[in-house]
A protein has these predicted regions:
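General beta-strand structural signal in soluble alpha/beta enzymes
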Residues: 128, 154-159, 199-203, 262, ...
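NAD(P)+-binding Rossmann beta1-loop-alpha1 motif at the extreme N-terminus of oxidoreductases
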Residues: 27-81
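Rossmann-like NAD(P)(H) cofactor-binding subdomain of soluble oxidoreductases
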Residues: 83, 89-172, 188
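Cationic, low-complexity basic patches in intrinsically disordered or flexible, solvent-exposed regions
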Residues: 15-18
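NAD(P)-dependent Rossmann-like dehydrogenase/reductase catalytic/cofactor-binding core
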Residues: 215, 222-226, 251-261, 269-355
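Internal alpha-helical scaffold of NAD(P)-dependent oxidoreductase catalytic cores
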Residues: 111, 148-154, 172-220, 224-259
């Protein structure tokens, strides 16, 4: 009799523990507003929805949003990957923000200022996946948010080596999450972290943001080099010296050197410069093959952040008296001042210096 009672008690205890875990899991699920329905915003929205969060995916084009709702996928930017049932497309920006526990921006850098000026102040804080700087003011995106919502407003930037299709397909990925507020950072970490995504924490907002902006320009450079047929040696040199440029700029602005050796720095740089899933690299490949810039952009079909950010990064470097010869040559090429082979020649003929 006692054996039966003990066995029954253990069984009931296990059932109670399971019910408690399920209840706590349900309680921890949140409503997320993902502002930006391009490939990256959609991929992260799919990830968040798959792990149980109700996810509102905002897009600026009503026809695009209607198509996503009808097909339960994003055929324009992430075809072939179905939406979970709890991922809801929307074209109502304000309603998305007001309905959400957490707001994440995933629009291109040139649209970032417009979005934060339209939305009401989020209750918890603001996170973004956008990689770049503001083209009008040459400011980091964190500076724009501070101007809009205050310097003490909790923010987070999520960056690192990550392609949209792989995240949407639940393939293993590691990211860096930088924030100015440890409590908000902890909440965002809990929101994202899962078996397929490992999130590392940082407080170096400047470094993480610069890494995300500069690596796109360097990916264009590597694409051009490969398009010209210059081989692996040249690409390795561009990545290595590009990392040096990125680090110099960051240190001049108060970033930490270890950030540039981490996921947001060398991790994202190597991925973007070497894999053809990178639209910046593919854009560079086309330029190296003498495809005109407008036609190259048309063939890519999505925003090429490196093209939009080259002038801004060079302006920031000039302001901080930092030499960035690779970025400067890419900027000159994008403005029609030099052609691809001349840009390489200009880099190779620079005066000798210590590494």
């Amino acid at each position: 009799m006692m054996l039966y009672i003990c066995s029954s008690w253990k069984k009931n205890k296990k059932q109670l523990e399971l019910k408690t875990r399920l209840f706590l899991t349900k309680m921890n699920k949140k409503t997320i507003a993902m502002l930006g329905a391009g490939s990256w915003g959609t991929a992260v929205a799919i990830h968040l929805a798959k792990i149980g969060h109700k996810t509102l995916l905002w897009g600026h084009n009503p026809q695009h949003v209607a198509l996503m709702a009808e097909q339960h996928s994003n055929p324009a930017y992430l075809p072939g990957i179905p939406f979970p049932e709890n991922l809801i497309p929307s074209d109502d920006l304000i309603e998305c923000v007001q309905s959400a526990d957490y707001v994440i921006i995933a629009v291109p850098s040139h649209a970032f200022a417009e979005i934060i000026n339209k939305i009401p102040k989020p209750t918890q804080g603001l996170a973004w996946l956008t990689k770049g700087v503001d083209p009008a003011s040459h400011q980091l995106l964190s500076q724009l948010v501070a101007s809009r919502f205050g310097v003490d407003f909790p923010i987070a930037v999520i960056s690192g080596p990550s392609f949209a299709k792989e995240v949407a397909r639940f393939l293993p990925t590691a990211l860096t999450l930088a924030s100015n507020n440890t409590n908000y950072q902890k909440k965002m970490h809990q929101l994202f972290h899962h078996d397929n995504i490992r999130v590392y924490l940082s407080d170096d907002l400047i470094g993480v943001q610069l890494c995300g902006a500069v690596k796109n320009i360097l990916a264009i450079a590597c694409g051009i080099s490969d398009g010209l047929g210059y081989g692996a040696n040249a690409k390795a040199a561009l990545i290595t010296r590009g990392l040096a440029e990125m680090t110099r700029l960051g240190l001049s602005m108060g970033a930490r050197q270890d950030t540039f050796l981490g996921l947001a720095g060398v991790g994202d740089l190597v991925l973007t410069c070497t894999d053809d899933q990178s639209r910046n690299r593919r854009f560079g490949l086309l330029l190296g093959r003498e495809v005109p810039i407008p036609e190259a952009e048309h063939q890519i079909g999505q925003v090429v952040e490196g093209k939009h950010n080259a002038a801004q990064i060079c302006a920031i470097a000039n302001k901080n008296k930092v030499e960035m010869p690779i970025c400067e040559q890419i900027n000159a090429l994008l403005h029609g001042i030099v052609h691809a082979q001349q840009a390489v020649s200009n880099l190779m003929s620079r005066p000798a210096k210590e590494e």
